[in-house]
Amino acid sequence: MRLNSLRPAAGSRPDANRVGRGAGTGNGKTAGRGHKGQHSRSGGFTKVGFEGGQMPLQRRVPKVGFRSRKALTRAEVRLSELNKVEGDTVDLLTLKQAGIINRGVRTAKVIASGKVERAVTVQGLAVTKGAREAIEAAGGKVEA
């Protein structure tokens, strides 16, 4: 066996469909393009989304909302999620290590949702008034 004698397995590569080569082939004369019209011509195509001059769907439907790029760098943390953090101090780094917030987050805010079950020290995070009261009631403290 040599490289120049390698052949694909029989039947694994079907022959290309040769159009316009006689009526007996089933693709002769019009070559599968039908009669007349834009699509029968060479270069005959329409842009994606083109609806023949009618106002296309993409332009008929109103624009709605947007995705804030600030949301990618900010996060909200529930009080109940503070229990998942190991250790007594909670800051941006420990929240990331616990898998509570994403890597790209730069600022986080603790909101009053759920309960804190142990005393924790919150450092460098924004805290709502209700969350601050709950943390202090559990014996913890909030540091700027």
Curated annotation (Swiss-Prot):
Keywords: Ribonucleoprotein, Ribosomal protein, RNA-binding, rRNA-binding. Pfam families: Ribosomal_L27A. Signal peptide: none annotated. The keyword Ribonucleoprotein applies. PROSITE patterns: RIBOSOMAL_L15. Residues 21-31 have a biased composition (Gly residues). Gene3D superfamilies: 3.100.10.10. InterPro entries: Ribosomal_uL15, Ribosomal_uL15/eL18, Ribosomal_uL15/eL18_sf, Ribosomal_uL15_bac-type, Ribosomal_uL15_CS. One of its GO terms (cellular component) is cytosolic large ribosomal subunit. SUPFAM superfamilies: Ribosomal proteins L15p and L18e (SSF52080). It comes from the Bacteria. One of its GO terms (biological process) is translation. GO terms for molecular function: rRNA binding; structural constituent of ribosome. Residues 1-60 are annotated as: Disordered. Belongs to the universal ribosomal protein uL15 family. Part of the 50S ribosomal subunit. Binds to the 23S rRNA. This is Large ribosomal subunit protein uL15. The gene is rplO.
